[in-house]
């Protein structure tokens, strides 16, 4: 079928809106008409080849839409369902079978390499040339996408569907890093480095978790103001104050839970050094490939736990509907992070995101 998609054809290149041909759904696939799609930092990192994915490619991995058709083996959703599209996992490796799909051993290819699970190219341009697709099992910078049963999450119809796409990645990552991975007990303290969409989602999740001290660290005052509005009890601007010293003025021994969302190695070092003995430091920010940080191993030896977190360690079929319900109850107001753009202004949305003008751009598609 003919669809419209935003294609990146060269490193650092623009998103080009083109009419392309999309395959019919295979037996395990779902054809989704996109209503809106979030634009995520990972889309831009891959566009610019900091992660070397093949080009040309249709990116987009925070899709929300309506099921149009399903393959013969699909049972979880049916035409007319409202869905959020998230990351692909195989469902058959040890990690998936153990209930930890974010550690899937077979997820890299289907999420990043531009082909379906069976190795097919699912999008061709008007000249018949292959265009990479199936990005995160969806490629949702398009009017329609092919997803899989495993990365298609059914959601309620009584919440605006155009809001929900970012729950598939960025917001799920921030909230899940707190609620699923770090899991701080009520009454505890957490420091969150970086107050972008992921970091502010973590702030809101810390409120849900019952943390009584929530420290947000960022160099942009407008983001810190929003962090306070969303529940941060303390804000620190590293441009004005050393964040390690500022945190230790609040907690002399450091904080028990720390989350680093910026992807900047120097900030990760600050996050580690802000932690208490026995503390846990989660890393979700995506630095350039090969980035390293200098850390005194003896500092970590004192029962500190340094861990990477993928997609908030979420089981999306469970976690995304929970976030939707928290939003419905007014306990997780992630809509305050979102700014909408028409699909044909995708390049402006990307520029605004890179400049920090917009926290979470969402493209209205159909």
UniProtKB/Swiss-Prot annotation:
Entry note: cofactor: Binds 2 Zn(2+) ions per subunit.
Residues reported in the UniProt entry to bind Zn(2+) 2: 90, 93, 96, 104
UniProt GO BP: formaldehyde catabolic process
Entry GO CC: cytosol
A family per Pfam: ADH_N
Residues reported to bind Zn(2+) 1: 40, 61, 169
Gene3D superfamilies: Medium-chain alcohol dehydrogenases, catalytic domain (3.90.180.10), NAD(P)-binding Rossmann-like Domain (3.40.50.720)
An example Gene Ontology molecular-function term: aryl-alcohol dehydrogenase (NAD+) activity
Enzyme Commission number(s) of this protein: 1.1.1.90
InterPro entries (UniProt xref): ADH-like_C, ADH-like_N, ADH_Zn_CS, GroES-like_sf, NAD(P)-bd_dom_sf
Cofactor field: Zn(2+)
Swiss-Prot/TrEMBL catalytic activity: an aromatic primary alcohol + NAD(+) = an aromatic aldehyde + NADH + H(+)
Keywords tagged on the record: Aromatic hydrocarbons catabolism, Metal-binding, NAD, Oxidoreductase, Plasmid, Zinc
EC supergroup of this enzyme: oxidoreductase
Domain of life: Bacteria
Membership in a protein family: Belongs to the zinc-containing alcohol dehydrogenase family.
Subunit relationships: Homodimer.
General function of this protein: Oxidizes primary alcohols with an aromatic or cyclohex-1-ene ring. It is highly specific for benzyl alcohol.
Protein name per Swiss-Prot or TrEMBL: Aryl-alcohol dehydrogenase
Natural source organism: Pseudomonas putida
Gene name linked to the record: xylB
């Amino acid at each position: 079928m003919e669809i419209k998609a935003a294609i990146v054809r060269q490193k650092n290149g623009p998103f080009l809106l083109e009419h392309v041909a999309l395959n019919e759904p295979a037996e395990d696939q779902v054809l989704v008409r996109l209503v809106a799609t979030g634009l995520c930092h990972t889309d831009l990192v891959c566009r610019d080849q900091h992660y070397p994915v093949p080009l040309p490619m249709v990116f987009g991995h925070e899709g929300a839409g309506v099921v149009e058709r399903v393959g013969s083996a699909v049972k979880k959703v049916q035409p007319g369902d409202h869905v959020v599209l998230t990351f692909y996992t195989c469902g058959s490796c040890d990690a998936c079978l153990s209930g930890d799909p974010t550690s899937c051993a077979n997820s890299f290819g289907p999420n990043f390499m531009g082909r379906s699970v069976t190795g097919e190219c699912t999008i061709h341009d008007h000249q018949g040339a292959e265009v990479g697709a199936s990005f995160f099992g969806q490629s949702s910078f398009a009017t329609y996408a092919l997803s899989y049963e495993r990365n298609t999450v059914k959601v309620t119809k009584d919440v605006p569907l155009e809001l929900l796409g970012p729950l598939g990645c960025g917001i799920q990552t921030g909230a899940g890093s707190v609620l699923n991975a770090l899991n701080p007990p009520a009454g505890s303290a957490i420091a969150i480095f970086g107050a972008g969409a992921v970091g502010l989602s973590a702030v809101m999740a810390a409120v849900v978790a019952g943390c009584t001290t929530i420290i947000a660290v960022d160099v942009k005052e407008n983001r810190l103001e929003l962090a306070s509005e969303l529940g941060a009890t303390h804000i620190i601007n590293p441009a004005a104050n050393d964040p390690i010293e500022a945190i230790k003025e609040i907690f002399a021994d450091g904080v028990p839970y720390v989350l680093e969302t910026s992807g900047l190695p120097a900030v990760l070092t600050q996050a580690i050094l802000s932690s208490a003995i026995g503390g846990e430091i989660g890393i979700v920010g995506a630095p350039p490939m090969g980035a390293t940080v200098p850390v005194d191993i003896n500092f970590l030896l004192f029962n500190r736990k340094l861990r990477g977190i993928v997609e908030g360690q979420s089981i999306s079929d469970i976690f995304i509907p929970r976030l939707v319900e928290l939003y419905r109850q007014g306990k997780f107001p992630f809509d305050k992070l979102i700014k909408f753009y028409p699909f044909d202004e995708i390049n402006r949305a990307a520029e605004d995101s890179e400049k920090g003008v917009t926290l979470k751009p969402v493209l209205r598609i159909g």
